[in-house]
Curated annotation (Swiss-Prot):
Family to which this protein belongs: Belongs to the exportin family.
Cellular location(s): Nucleus; Cytoplasm
Name under which the protein is recorded: Exportin-T
BP-aspect Gene Ontology terms: tRNA processing; tRNA re-export from nucleus
GO molecular function: small GTPase binding; tRNA binding
Function statement: tRNA nucleus export receptor which facilitates tRNA translocation across the nuclear pore complex. Involved in pre-tRNA splicing, probably by affecting the interaction of pre-tRNA with splicing endonuclease.
GO CC terms, sorted: cytoplasm; nuclear matrix; nuclear pore
Signal peptide: none
Transmembrane segments: none
């Protein structure tokens, strides 16, 4: 069996084995794994002398490891494993080792197995666990820890034991946590003194002899210190061993000293140990951490080599981690109102002592170092904000802190803006800027006056320098000033982050106006560096309100935008198109009659050149700002078309000129469309894409002309000038021609849907006669359910906006529209996406019918033209109402509301009353014969079909409770319209079918107009019958 098992492992893991042979071997191994006694074979194989191959021993040990950890071996079996492994370890790692130490992967698995044995047996069965492995470290009965292989195994086991029972990063179950705490208590009681002494012995033995041993020892100390007595690691003897390692001079050529860095990390873990405020402040003093950090910052690697390639950024990062831990604890003590005066005084001194070092590391040229101390600086600023009125000792800190934050916002000298190689570095820097912005806001929250004065001076000095140096000025300094202007709005704008409620800081608002004036007057828009131009445009857009009160600056800024729209740098050029639109859109009322000039200036950018993307382009994941593909350029062109629409339709532009400008832009598009349409009809991909782009451009231009306030108040929208509407009617007709020819193409339909929704804003009711053509084109046989749902949403908007003018058009188009929708509702479902689209179509369909009824256009549903689809309409709505499944709850609720509105509108006058003495003597008089009976046999029956559905649980689910609310309303309406017929139907049909009497229900329904009372009865009824 042993030989078979060994051979199977070798075959299974031999890359030269055939697939068939390997499969047989793996199948055999899997069978062996199911044998509860297989671990015995594996233990023997692993400890055998002479040794088996490394792979055989690793697989064997893994199975032993699994047995110890997961199979619940009893005490004798565990003792057998322990004795076998201990005997093997003594032969392999002891002072008189006969065999070579195991490779790293086997040692790792061995250490893990021994750790599991420790967990199982240290309480009882292997009380000498640590003694046994400590004995391996010495060749002279403990006189010195000179056996290297034994020392390394001992340290690995200590590290593994900590990870298993004390690592706070691992989530533990309740029983496991108790077990671990018990084991830690036993270690403290039995062996902690001896283990701590062994660390001293090992450091004394191997310092300057074997860095690997020293580093591993320090890591073990750093792990264990969190849960042992602190005195064991802060004794003078221990510190005499650790501190020289912290400060040792690095003589390596590669500037890396992992022992020194690990020693500093160990200090960090010692400082991070939880303890009372007074003890923590004393610990910081005892360890002389202030002096240590000062010496480290003055070391050659951090001082002399600063700004050179030999700068030791690894050292800077570990020092920053230590300092961040210290400062976090110091601030925590200062925040504690319960600490005594002496402890607080110590914390104050530590704060003053460590702040310069904190700012030095915060200002480090390596952003990783800066980021390491941001948490403690954040804590400090949060504390200062809570203090209220700051004493001088605190207020004096703010200026150097703010200065350091602002300086860190600056691009460093090595940064290369805008290059492909530097994209990731720039993205990381922008993320750092966001974190720095939070710190800067914290300073402003503590002292707004300082913040305003500091940044005003910074910006003022930068513009003074620009005036003196012109284009020779360092772009990084100018970028910093512009970045700070951009952030300054946190104080100066209403409802911004630092503005109290809706009131901005008055002084900040005044200073911002000064900054903006200086910026516009400085000629910065002609600066040669693209980063500055982008910042300039972003600021103009952000502070558009400034131009509303400083009209004199609008014209020069517009001129600058038009210039930058043609900039040679692609990132500036394409970004400027979007920002230009934002600028003119927000200042539409102030830009004046400048459309002719602007159109002439940017007309060279308007011709559309569609390019079918290649497969490589489709796979390119470029960011928006760096994407210079044809598709990205076209999207940018759309911003220009919309901007032209905005500028051309200002209140100061005569209507005839508006129409002229629209025509001048659209005529070339019409011509281009007529040229490409024949090719597009024959399937030419480039021509189809060109038509798509032209349609999108026409729609986007219309969007620019549309009243910007119509979406907020559709009932009070500005009527488009007749001359402008006439021009866009031509656009609508041109698009319809293309749609009619190409409506089998989904992309073309999508572009037409977009254009249609935007043309509504400039055509208003004049588009209504074209609606049948739009429906014919947009709802083709190849239209998806998504497309139908989207178009129904548009029609809801049209019905709402033009309810007084749409009846005749709606009467004409309703039947073909509903027939398309019915076809979509009945299509087979293939997969989750289809199901989601069907749910959306159902919702939009019943919402559309609801909008018709709400706007008193219900007559169109039963008109002569649409009688043929009325029955299908009602049946489809009832089907949706009765479909109580996830994803259809909203549609079901709306459907019952639609049925209630139909009953109210066509059920005739009320023939019954609801109250303490209800009456039901009248004769039903529905709007058309038989509708009263239809309500009973169909609407009423639908209500009770849903209420008997086991998925309908309104007493436990808020969404179905809303459906019950609509059902209750519908039932009361049917009762009011049919009276005694309703009562009789309930008594003879409905309730006998469900096996109960109708009296309680009728009493609840007819005695109160309060729906809640009826719903309460129905909920209780349904709950009792489930």
């Amino acid at each position: 069996m042993d030989a078979q098992f060994e051979k199977a492992i070798e075959i299974a893991f031999d890359p030269r084995s055939s697939h068939a042979l390997k499969s047989q071997a793996l199948e055999f191994l899997n069978q062996v794994r199911t044998d509860v006694q297989a671990w015995r074979i594996c233990a023997a194989l692993f400890t055998r002398s002479p040794r088996a191959s490394d792979i055989v021993r690793h697989v064997s040990l893994e199975m032993v490891n699994n047995a110890v950890h997961s199979q619940g071996l009893d005490a004798p079996d565990l003792a057998f494993v322990k004795n076998s492994l201990l005997d093997y370890i003594t032969r392999t790692y002891g002072p008189n080792a006969q065999d070579q130490a195991d490779p790293a992967n086997v040692q790792n698995k061995l250490t893990q197995t021994l750790t599991y044995l420790f967990v199982a047996l240290y309480g009882e069965g292997w009380e000498t666990f640590f003694d046994d492995f400590l004995a391996l470290t010495s060749s002279q009965n403990g006189a010195s820890r000179d056996n290297l292989s034994g020392v390394m195994l001992y340290l690995r086991i200590l590290s593994s034991v900590h990870d298993e029972i004390a690592d706070l990063m691992i989530s533990r179950q309740g029983n496991e946590s108790k077990r671990n705490n018990d084991l830690k208590d036993l270690i403290r009681e039995r062996h902690m003194q001896k283990i701590a002494m062994s660390w001293q012995d090992i450091l004394a033995q191997w310092t300057n002899k074997h860095d690997g041993v020293v580093e591993l020892t320090l890591k073990v100390i750093g792990k264990w210190v969190s849960w042992i007595d602190i005195s064991l690691v802060v004794s003078q003897d221990m510190q005499n061993l650790i501190l020289p390692l912290v400060g040792r001079v690095n003589n390596t050529s590669n500037n890396i000293d992992t022992v020194r860095d690990t020693a500093i990390d160990t200090l960090t873990e010692i400082v991070a140990k939880k303890m009372g405020p007074s003890h923590k402040m004393e610990l910081i003093s005892f360890l002389n951490l202030g002096g240590i950090i000062t010496e480290l910052l003055a070391s050659q690697g951090l001082h002399e080599f600063k700004g050179t390639s030999r700068y030791d950024n690894d050292l800077a990062e570990v020092v920053a981690k230590l300092l961040n831990t210290i400062m976090t604890d110091v601030v925590r003590v200062l925040e504690d109102n319960k600490v005594d005066a002496e402890t607080r005084a110590k914390a104050e001194r530590h704060l003053q002592d460590f702040l310069p070092a904190l700012l030095r590391l915060f200002s480090d040229e390596f952003d990783e170092v800066c980021s390491t101390v941001i948490p403690s600086l954040t804590d400090l600023l949060t504390f200062l904000r809570r203090v209220g009125t700051l004493p001088d000792s605190y207020s004096q800190m703010l200026r150097p802190i703010l200065s350091a934050i602002v300086a860190k916002m600056r691009y460093d000298e090595t940064s290369s803006w805008g290059t492909e190689d530097g994209e990731s570095d720039e993205a990381e820097f922008q993320e750092l800027r966001k974190r720095l912005q939070i710190l800067q806001k914290s300073v402003a929250a503590v002292d707004q006056t300082l913040y305003i004065e500091f940044l005003s001076n910074l910006v003022g000095n930068m513009f003074a320098t620009l005036e003196q140096q012109g284009p020779q000025m360092d772009w990084r300094d100018l970028d910093l000033a512009l970045h700070e202007i951009y952030l300054f709005g946190e104080l100066a704008l209403p409802n911004a982050g630092l503005a109290h409620k809706s009131e901005p800081n008055v002084v900040a608002t005044e200073r911002l106006a000064v900054m903006m004036s200086k910026m516009v007057e400085s000629g910065i828009a002609n600066f040669p560096h693209p980063a500055i131009l982008l910042q300039y445009m972003e600021i103009c857009v952000r502070y558009h309100a400034f131009f509303e009160s400083h009209h004199q600056y609008i014209a020069p800024v517009l001129e600058n935008f038009v210039h930058l729209i043609h900039h040679e740098h692609p990132r500036v050029r394409t970004r400027s198109w979007y920002l230009f639109l934002r600028f003119v859109k927000q200042l539409r009322a102030q830009v004046g009659n400048v459309a002719k000039t602007v159109i002439q200036s940017i007309s060279d950018l308007l011709p559309i050149k569609a390019e079918v993307p290649s497969t490589e382009a489709e796979d390119d994941m470029s960011s928006d700002e760096s994407d210079h593909s044809a598709d990205a350029i076209f999207n940018g062109q759309l911003y220009l078309f919309e901007a032209i629409g905005c500028i051309s339709s200002t209140s100061t532009t005569p209507e005839t000129d508006q129409a002229l400008y629209a025509r001048s832009v659209m005529e070339p598009l019409f011509s281009d469309m007529s040229v490409h349409l024949p090719r597009a009809k024959s399937g030419d991909a480039q021509a189809i894409l060109q038509i798509h782009h032209i349609i999108m451009a026409l729609g986007t231009l219309a969007n620019g002309f549309a009243d910007p306030n119509q979406s907020q108040n559709p009932n009070n929208q500005r009527t488009p000038p007749q001359a402008v509407s006439a021009e866009f009617s031509r656009a609508s007709e041109a698009i319809l021609v293309a749609l009619n020819e190409l409506n089998t193409n989904g992309e073309i339909r999508a572009a037409c849907r977009s254009a249609f929704s935007r043309l509504l804003g400039v055509l208003g009711a004049t588009i209504l006669p074209q609606l049948p053509q739009w429906i014919e084109g947009l709802l083709s046989q190849s239209s998806s359910k998504d497309e139908m749902a989207f178009f129904l949403r548009l029609l809801e908007q049209i019905v709402y906006n033009f309810k007084g003018e749409i009846y005749n058009i709606l009467d004409l188009l309703l039947t073909p529209l509903l027939q398309r929708v019915f076809a979509g509702l009945s299509e087979p479902i293939n997969g989750t996406d289809d199901e989601i689209q069907l749910q959306e179509l159902r919702r939009e369909y019943v919402s559309f019918v609801q909008v018709i009824l709400i706007n008193e256009l219900g007559g169109v549903l039963v008109s002569t033209s649409n009688q043929g689809v009325f029955e299908s309409l009602v049946n489809s709505i009832m089907t949706i109402a009765k479909t109580i499944v996830h994803g259809n709850i909203v549609a079901s609720r709306i459907s019952f509301n639609v049925l209630a509105r139909m009953a109210q509108q066509w059920g005739g006058p009320d023939v019954a009353t609801i109250g303490e003495n209800p009456t039901a003597n009248g004769v039903p008089a529905p709007a058309f014969p038989g509708f009263d009976q239809f309500m009973l046999t169909q609407f009423h029956a639908a209500c009770w079909e849903v209420m008997q559905d086991i998925n309908f649980r309104p007493y436990a689910d808020a969404q179905t409770r809303q459906i019950l609310n609509e059902i209750t309303g519908l039932e009361q309406i049917i009762y009011l319209k049919t009276g005694e017929k309703f009562i009789s139907h309930c008594q003879t049909v409905t309730f006998p079918a469900v096996g109960m009497g109708a009296e309680d229900f009728l009493r609840a329904l007819t005695s109160s107009t309060d729906r809640k009372a009826v719903m309460a009865y129905l909920q209780q009824l349904l709950k009792s019958r489930r």
